[in-house]
A protein has these predicted regions:
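Rieske [2Fe-2S] iron-sulfur-binding domain
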Residues: 13-107, 111
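Basic/polar N-terminal segments that are highly enriched at the extreme N-terminus
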Residues: 1-2, 110
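Short amphipathic
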Residues: 3-11
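Short coil-to-beta-strand transition motifs
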Residues: 2-4, 87-88
Length: 112
C-alpha cells in the first residue's frame, strides 16, 4: 500500500449508494460507495457539524446531503453545492484486495 494510507473498512461491508462514518488516526471520516467506486470526506458538515457518513447519497449526481439541514456536497471533491465556498476535505482512497484504504495525510484535490 502506498505510504500514508491506512485501512478503513472491508469494501463488501459498504453497499453501493451508502456512506459510513469511521475513525482513522483520530479523525472522523465519511467513506462512500458510489457504484463500486469509493470516496472519503471529512465527516462533519461545516454548517452544524452533521455527520456526512449518515447523509443521503445521490449516486447519479455523486453527492451527499447532510442529514441535519440538507447541505449538499460533491462526494468526489468535497465541494459544497448548496453553499459554494464551504467545502469539506476530500481524502485519497485506494481499493486493495477488497479493502478500502484512506490517506488522511493529504487532500484528494491537491495531492498534498
Amino acid at each position: 500500500m502506498p505510504e500514508n494510507f491506512l485501512p478503513a473498512l472491508d469494501a463488501a461491508a459498504l453497499p453501493p449508494g451508502k456512506g459510513e462514518t469511521i475513525e482513522i488516526a483520530g479523525q472522523r471520516i465519511a467513506v462512500f460507495n458510489v457504484g463500486g467506486e469509493f470516496y472519503a470526506l471529512h465527516d462533519a458538515c461545516p454548517h452544524r457539524g452533521g455527520p456526512l457518513g449518515s447523509g443521503w447519497v445521490e449516486g447519479e449526481k455523486c453527492t451527499v446531503a447532510c442529514p441535519l439541514h440538507g447541505w449538499e456536497f460533491d462526494i468526489k471533491t468535497g465541494a459544497c453545492i448548496s453553499m459554494p465556498g464551504r467545502p469539506v476535505r476530500a481524502y485519497p482512497v485506494r481499493l486493495v484486495e477488497g479493502k478500502v484504504w484512506v490517506s488522511v495525510q493529504q487532500s484528494a484535490a491537491s495531492g498534498q
